[in-house]
Design a protein with these regions (language model features):
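N-terminus-centric sequence/structural signature that marks the extreme N-terminus
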Residues: 1-100
Length: 100
C-alpha cells in the first residue's frame, strides 16, 4: 500500500521529507514530492502495475498544471486507456494512475 501525505499552506522545505520518512514503510519502491508556494504532496510507492520511473508519483499531466497522487487500482484501466488513446491522448508510461 502506498503512502500519501500533503499540506496546504506556506512551503516549509523540510516538511515533505519528514512526511515521507514517517510513511516510508508503506512504499518501498520509491518516493516523490511536489510543491508550490501554497501546497505540497509527498508520496511513497508500492509499485504494482508500472514498475518503471514513468509510474512515479506525484504525477503531473502533460501541461504540468494538474498534479496527482493516487493509491488504488483501476481494474478496467486498460479499456479506459484504449478509449483515451483513440481520442488522441498520448501516455508516457503504463500505470493506471496516468489514466486518471
Amino acid at each position: 500500500m502506498c503512502g500519501i501525505a500533503g499540506y496546504v499552506g506556506r512551503f516549509e522545505p523540510s516538511l515533505l521529507g519528514q512526511m515521507n520518512r514517517a510513511q516510508g514503510h508503506r512504499g518501498p519502491d520509491g518516493s516523490g514530492q511536489w510543491h508550490d508556494a501554497e501546497a505540497g504532496l509527498a508520496h511513497v510507492r508500492l509499485a504494482i502495475l508500472d514498475l518503471s520511473p514513468a509510474g512515479a508519483q506525484p504525477m503531473a499531466d502533460a501541461t504540468g498544471r494538474v498534479i496527482l497522487s493516487f493509491n488504488g487500482e483501476i481494474y478496467n484501466y486498460r479499456e479506459l486507456r484504449a478509449d483515451l488513446e483513440r481520442q488522441g491522448v498520448v501516455f508516457r508510461g503504463g500505470s493506471d494512475t496516468e489514466v486518471l
